[in-house]
């Protein structure tokens, strides 16, 4: 009996001889939906022949996933590695082809590709998974986590100081961090401001000079998010204490209908409230929240006749004890009197207590991989805000595909949370 081996384009070996890691690499690229890439690549193909088309985007995914440092090194690896050629359609482009790709697509084109990967993840139920720890009556929608990452720029950063004391660099889109950093000291670079879901899927990343405050970017970041994903509904956004201002609390809820869960600094409440922010009844007993009215923008508290359980008798009679309603005396707090103290997610509310630990857990997990996602390797010398933005979006695309692949392979919903109940 004669056996024939059909050669696969780009693959110089028998597929049966591949190692488990190599087969996993092939399976990863087999799960990439071509409809996430091809329509965008074809739209931005230019006036000449389409050439490599979507294959160049796949090559960029190879670069990020395999941690290849430069376009030149990527072009060399595509020529030498048959697995890389196989998953990219047997292409062997020069390093200039990737520069042309960035100029043609720009941040807008790469953003469109990332949007399609996010839509794919949404179709699999990865953006808004069930989290059993959260209250069932919470506001429905996707829970967001905001964070920023400092990116060191290693190329063309030689600076000159003018007479006013301002620094000017070869790349005018970079700046000093603005203050001493615990790790990078006074390095020069950009800052990546990102929003991701509570399950870890990155949704949007915007770049700014390193000295721009997170507070100055967060509203614009949410505005871009809502405009980019108009078919999605967002409910909460978890932020660290650096965002804890009355204006941010107010604007996020009033302009976007999203409840900000911000790690609070110490607050002092007015007369009539205890130190934890609970209102007191006229006889000094602590009241408990009963319902949050999002339409009327107020929270209703009730005493639930707690004085009946008190061992100390009241000095004056309480008329609410005789009422048939179990809630007893009621009182309202209004969002307009201060979103930090009386808003929809105050520190003593159940949703705040449940979401706060997720912020800590996600930050610790992503803190270990931030440099793997966005860190500007020393041999990467991207210049200009557009090229650095593309660099960050490429990492977001790969991270989104990583989460999709893990789910299709093992059913794992999130890389940062244990949601496989």
Label for each model-derived stretch:
Residues 49, 76, 107-254, 263-265:
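Polybasic low-complexity intrinsically disordered regions
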Residues 49-120:
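Short, positively charged, Gly/Tyr-enriched micro-motifs
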Residues 15-66:
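Basic, short loop/linker segments at the boundary and entry of helix-turn-helix/winged-helix-like folds
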Residues 352-421:
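Basic, amphipathic alpha-helical segments enriched in Lys/Arg and hydrophobic/aromatic residues
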């Amino acid at each position: 009996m004669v056996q024939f081996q059909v050669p696969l384009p780009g693959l110089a070996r028998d597929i049966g001889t591949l190692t488990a890691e190599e087969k996993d690499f092939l399976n990863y690229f087999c799960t990439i939906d071509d409809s996430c890439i091809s329509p965008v690549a074809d739209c931005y193909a230019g006036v000449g022949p389409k050439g490599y088309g979507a294959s160049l985007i796949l090559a960029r995914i190879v670069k990020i996933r395999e941690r290849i440092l430069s376009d030149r090194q990527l072009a060399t690896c595509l020529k030498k590695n048959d697995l890389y050629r196989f998953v990219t359609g047997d292409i062997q482009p020069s390093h200039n082809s990737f520069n042309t790709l960035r100029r043609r697509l720009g941040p807008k084109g790469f953003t469109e590709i990332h949007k399609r990967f996010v839509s794919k993840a949404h179709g699999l139920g990865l953006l808004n998974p069930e989290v059993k720890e959260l209250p069932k009556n919470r506001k429905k929608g996707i829970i967001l986590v905001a964070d920023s990452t400092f990116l060191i720029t290693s190329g063309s950063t030689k600076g000159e100081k003018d007479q006013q004391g301002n620094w000017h660099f070869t790349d005018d889109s970079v700046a000093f961090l603005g203050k001493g950093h615990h790790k990078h000291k006074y390095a020069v670079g950009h800052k990546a401001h990102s929003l991701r879901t509570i399950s870890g899927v990155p949704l949007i990343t915007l770049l700014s000079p390193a000295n721009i405050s997170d507070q100055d970017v967060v509203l614009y970041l949410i505005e871009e998010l809502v405009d980019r994903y108009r078919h999605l509904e967002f409910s909460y956004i978890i932020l660290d204490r650096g965002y804890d201002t009355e204006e941010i609390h107010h604007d996020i809820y009033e302009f976007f209908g999203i409840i900000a869960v911000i790690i609070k600094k110490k607050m002092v409440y007015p007369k009539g409230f205890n130190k934890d922010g609970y209102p007191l009844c006229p006889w000094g007993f602590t009241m408990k929240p009963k319902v949050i009215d999002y339409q009327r923008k107020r929270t209703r508290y009730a005493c639930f006749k707690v004085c009946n359980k008190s061992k100390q008798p009241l000095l004056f009679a309480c008329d609410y004890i005789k009422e048939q309603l179990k809630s007893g005396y009621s009182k309202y707090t209004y969002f307009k009197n201060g979103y930090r103290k009386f808003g929809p997610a105050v520190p003593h509310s159940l949703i705040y207590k449940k979401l706060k630990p997720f912020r800590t857990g996600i930050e610790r997990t992503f803190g270990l991989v931030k440099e793997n996602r966005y860190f500007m390797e020393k041999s990467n010398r991207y210049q200009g805000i557009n090229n650095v933005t593309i660099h960050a979006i490429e990492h977001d695309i790969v991270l989104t595909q990583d989460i999709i692949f893990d789910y299709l392979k093992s059913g794992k919903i999130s890389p940062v949370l244990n949601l496989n109940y």
